[in-house]
């Protein structure tokens, strides 16, 4: 005979499908020596299925629910209410009722019990569904307990549970629910313990929230809780809150709010000794589960009882370093304006391209993959006084928030003493990744100011790309993978060539010099931005302007314009050929893709779909260009930019000449402007070169993926994205792969994609915080980094994906980050606000090139600014004001 009810002691963490997350975890907790768990039993998920499976009405309603989306709140509310009502009205099958009754007799039918929901998708390692279903406390009597079992089953369809499943792509028909019934504990105090600080994410700090009575008062937000921080067995901080209310159990069943006696309201809920004892309990539980835990506890008769433990799913991962030293990890992804999670092949491929000896099969350690993003370790740089000075000076020009974080860290003497000194520094001149040769080249190039250097460098690299294309076309198997290693070495040499990087730095140093001295002499901030418009040899700004030419071809064909509104990538060019004017449009777009088709959002990740793979991503920008610009706008905008730059240059020179020593100042500024104009555009080229290498190699790897699909090694060619480069190499060699790894990596990637990567974190897991200096900005304004000067007002368009960027003339783009692929969108907008970026990141450079006021590094901009609101962007003083709430 099938059993529907089990004692908690008979369950463990492997029985998620039977007992749900809460039941499985409680069963596992009961097996840890020294951990007290209230006695109880679990009604399995099979019991829920048995109770609802015979109801045709239930199946119909759940089917209808599955057709709704999370945004249809009224319909979700109505449908979920019907399902709950139906479940509560269904009789509990007799065999299940008998088993429940038997367990109640065993534990004492007249005892008070807590009746808790335990869903199968609850408290997973990668997602926490805490609070999505219901809990009922102090339930007494068999009939009441049975009634509340049905209520728990019904709570699988609360509005919040349904919407959460919709948002996280869980199927309503594939989730089920068990019910945990435990003897009530009537606590003097209760609360929540986090074995890692939920605010800073520091794994060394335990954070305890505590209040009087039952924990439901705390969880529901009814009362303020005490908070205690413990590190290494020492209480490091205590915040004792006034606790005016508490929830207590009633003898006859149910609960009641009570006022706390005045003399006890400001008393610690736990003594210091109890705090330290509870911290040890938390660490024991964490050690058992092998990861940080969110633990619900209660104190009764001087003894701690644990009523739940679940993984903390919001913590950002930390590298597992075994050296016993401190490390400091700075996000490279933020500097690249690409904070989305990357897939394993993308991470390992990028690492491989920038390690010292890519011919070795070990993948590089300059860039560390953490939580699906790229970080580099600053420990070596920060371990010395000189190194800290170099890092802080460098970050002052890149990201003020990171600068403030590192300044704060530099004050922690004990932390600095234990920093790792192994490996290379990232910023350390001569010993790290910045060479004296680069300094010499940039000085020489600035002094000579030879405008022919950049076209010569570009011509040489174009030839190398053509040769690469030819070499890769005929390669396959191990021969291909060996060639990829060689080509990545060539790519690194080309991208990091001292002469090439010297040209980049010549432009950026000229920009810094102009900004510094124009503010000093004329009180004008960020003047270089106004002098960078229509600069020569800027492949990224040209990418945006050349899409205007494509729009001019498209606008001549109404049939094509209509088709673009519903175009599909798979048949894009085939469909165009069948339309009037489609042949000309097809040739125009294909010519554009020949130059720029290797670009895409997040292009440093080789796995991301390129414009050549997903041409419809360009459609919104093409249609916006047709709507917002007259024919021939490319040349008009380029000429206008050059004219505005000339006017700005002359204005500055005229004003300088009025100053003491003005003629000499004006002469020097004229020279620096010439250097700026000759070299600032080239700053975009090295990355363009890199992604061209990426695209050629990606096409070769996808040819290998097609072969693996044909042989049945993988199911779809995109599966290779979830293998590292070396794993893919081995799969091709052996014609074999453990598909379980791919499945596991896909789940891991989805979990990483939901995390917010910190700009800077320590090896203890602490996410450092930093703030802008907001002293000179209007009250309530959002602070950021000045990326491009000027002040404008307009309608905010909050856009998270380039394919959703349907912009109108005068709109202000508000987004998380922009990389070069977003440049076509910049043509139509009035201004830019981005959550991520710095003065010299791509979005900032192109904003200056196009003359768009821009503020970047505005934290949570896409959440604080609503789509359609009218906002003011001050790119000079680096703030954004929300002017209307509509």
Predicted regions, residues:
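Core structural elements
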Residues: 106-107, 111-127, 300, 304-307, ...
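Glycine-rich beta-alpha junction loops
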Residues: 117-121, 131, 185, 210-214, ...
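Amphipathic alpha-helical segments within well-ordered protein domains
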Residues: 84, 133, 656-657, 705-706
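Conserved divalent-metal-coordinating catalytic cores
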Residues: 1-35, 39, 43-45, 52, ...
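N-terminal beta-alpha lobe that positions the nucleotide/phosphoryl donor
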Residues: 1-180, 189, 265-273, 278-287, ...
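Extended, domain-scale alpha-helical bundle/helix-rich regions
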Residues: 123, 672-759
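Accessory helical subdomains and C-terminal extensions of nucleic-acid helicases
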Residues: 104-113, 645-661, 665-669
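Short, compositionally biased low-complexity segments
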Residues: 52-80, 119-129, 235-260, 641-651, ...
């Amino acid at each position: 005979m099938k059993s529907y009810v089990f004692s908690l002691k008979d369950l463990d963490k492997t029985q998620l499908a039977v007992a749900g997350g809460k039941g499985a975890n409680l069963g596992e907790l009961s097996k840890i020596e020294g951990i007290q768990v209230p006695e109880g039993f679990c009604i399995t998920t099979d019991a829920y299925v048995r109770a609802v499976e015979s109801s045709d009405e239930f199946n119909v309603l759940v089917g209808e629910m599955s057709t709704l989306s999370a945004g249809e709140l009224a319909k979700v509310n109505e449908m979920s209410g019907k399902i709950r009502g139906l479940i509560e009205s269904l009789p509990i099958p007799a065999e299940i009722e008998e088993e429940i009754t038997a367990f109640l007799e065993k534990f004492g039918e007249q005892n008070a019990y807590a009746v808790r929901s335990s869903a199968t998708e609850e408290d997973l390692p990668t997602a926490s569904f805490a609070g999505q279903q219901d809990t009922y406390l102090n339930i007494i009597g068999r009939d009441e307990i049975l009634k509340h079992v049905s209520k728990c089953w019904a709570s699988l369809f609360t509005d919040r549970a349904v919407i959460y499943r919709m948002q996280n792509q869980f199927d309503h028909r594939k989730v089920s629910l068990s019910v945990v019934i435990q003897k009530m504990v009537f606590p003097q105090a209760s609360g929540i313990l986090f074995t890692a600080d939920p605010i800073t994410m520091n794994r060394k700090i335990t954070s305890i929230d505590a209040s009087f009575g039952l924990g439901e008062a705390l969880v529901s937000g009814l009362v303020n809780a005490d908070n205690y921080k413990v590190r290494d067995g020492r209480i490091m901080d205590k915040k004792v809150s006034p606790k005016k209310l508490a929830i207590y159990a009633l003898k006859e069943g149910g609960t009641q709010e009570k006022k706390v006696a005045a003399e006890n309201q400001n008393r610690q809920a736990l003594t210091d000794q109890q705090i330290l004892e509870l911290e040890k309990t938390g660490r024991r539980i964490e050690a058992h589960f092998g990861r940080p835990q969110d633990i619900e506890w209660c104190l009764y008769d001087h003894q701690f009882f644990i009523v739940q433990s679940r993984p903390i799913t919001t913590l950002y991962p930390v590298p597992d370093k075994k050296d016993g030293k401190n490390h400091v990890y700075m996000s490279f992804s933020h500097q690249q304006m690409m904070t989305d999670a990357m897939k394993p092949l993308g991470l390992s491929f990028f690492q491989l391209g920038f390690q010292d000896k890519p011919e070795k099969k070990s993948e590089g350690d300059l860039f560390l993959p953490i939580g699906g993003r790229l970080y580099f370790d600053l420990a070596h740089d920060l371990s010395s006084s000189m190194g800290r000075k170099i890092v802080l000076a460098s970050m002052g020009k890149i990201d003020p928030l990171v600068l403030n974080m590192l300044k704060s860290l530099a004050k922690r003497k004990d932390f600095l003493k234990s920093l790792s000194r192994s490996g290379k520094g990232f910023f350390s001149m001569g010993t790290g990744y910045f060479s004296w040769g680069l300094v010499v080249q940039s000085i020489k190039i600035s002094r000579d100011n030879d405008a022919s250097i950049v076209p010569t460098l570009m011509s040489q690299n174009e030839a190398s790309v053509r040769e690469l294309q030819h070499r890769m076309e005929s390669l396959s198997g191990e021969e291909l993978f060996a060639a990829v290693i060689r080509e990545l070495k060539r790519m690194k040499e080309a991208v990091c060539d001292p002469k090439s990087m010297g040209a980049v730095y010549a432009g950026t140093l000229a920009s810094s010099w102009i900004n510094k001295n124009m503010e000093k002499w004329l009180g004008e901030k960020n003047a270089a931005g106004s002098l960078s418009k229509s600069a020569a040899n800027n492949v990224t700004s040209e990418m945006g302007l050349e899409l205007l030419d494509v729009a001019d071809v498209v606008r001549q064909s109404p049939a094509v314009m209509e088709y673009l509104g519903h175009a599909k990538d798979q048949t894009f060019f085939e469909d165009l050929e069948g339309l009037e004017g489609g042949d000309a449009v097809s040739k125009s777009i294909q010519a554009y893709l020949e130059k720029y088709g290797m670009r895409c959002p997040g292009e440093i990740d080789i796995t991301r779909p390129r414009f050549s793979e997903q041409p419809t991503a360009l459609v919104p920008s093409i249609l916006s260009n047709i709507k917002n610009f007259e024919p021939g706008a490319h040349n008009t905008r380029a000429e206008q930019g050059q004219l505005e730059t000339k006017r700005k240059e002359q204005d500055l020179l005229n004003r300088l000449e009025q100053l003491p020593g003005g003629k000499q100042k004006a002469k020097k500024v004229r020279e620096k402007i010439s250097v700026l104009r000759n070299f600032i555009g080239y700053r975009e080229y090295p990355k363009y070169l890199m992604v061209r290498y990426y695209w050629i190699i990606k096409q070769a790897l996808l040819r290998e993926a097609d072969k693996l699909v044909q042989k049945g090694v993988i199911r779809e060619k995109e599966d290779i994205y979830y293998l590292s480069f070396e794993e893919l190499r081995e799969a091709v060699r052996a014609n074999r792969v453990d598909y379980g790894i791919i499945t596991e990596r896909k789940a891991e990637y989805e979990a990483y994609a939901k995390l917010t990567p910190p700009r800077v974190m320590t090896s203890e897991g602490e996410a450092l915080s930093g703030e802008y200096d907001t002293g000179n900005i209007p009250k309530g304004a959002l602070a950021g980094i000045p990326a491009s000067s000027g002040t404008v007002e307009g309608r905010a368009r909050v856009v998270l994906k380039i394919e959703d960027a349907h912009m109108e003339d005068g709109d202000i783009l508000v987004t998380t980050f922009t990389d070069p692929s977003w440049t076509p969108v910049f043509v139509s907008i009035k201004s830019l606000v981005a959550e991520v970026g710095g003065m010299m990141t791509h979005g900032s450079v192109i904003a200056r090139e196009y003359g768009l006021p821009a503020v970047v590094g505005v934290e949570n901009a896409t959440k604080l600014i609503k789509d359609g609101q009218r906002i003011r962007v001050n790119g000079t003083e680096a703030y954004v004001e929300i002017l209307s709430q509509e």
